[in-house]
């Protein structure tokens, strides 16, 4: 079974839940940003374009993570209604 790492407030946990299952359990402010990452949207400071035409999510702590094109288009649609 696949192991998932969870980073929270500087601590790392390993759990055996699949991301798909976590996505259904976690509150709606946890969003998928790529195939292997769920992120708390409240901790994302901004999205930035990168040299290859892609997008990175920049977190308040300074960490950066690649955002897939598919996920970014879903994130944009989510905020277009606001």
Regions found by a protein language model. Give the residues of each.
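Basic, polyanion-interacting recognition surfaces, primarily
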Residues: 1-82
């Amino acid at each position: 079974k696949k192991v998932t790492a969870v980073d929270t407030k500087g601590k790392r946990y390993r759990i055996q839940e699949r991301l798909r299952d976590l996505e259904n359990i976690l509150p709606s402010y946890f969003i998928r940003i790529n195939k292997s990452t769920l992120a708390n949207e409240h901790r994302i400071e901004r999205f930035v374009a990168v040299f290859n035409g892609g997008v990175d999510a920049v977190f308040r702590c300074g960490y950066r993570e690649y955002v897939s094109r598919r996920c970014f288009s879903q994130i944009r649609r989510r905020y277009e209604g606001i």
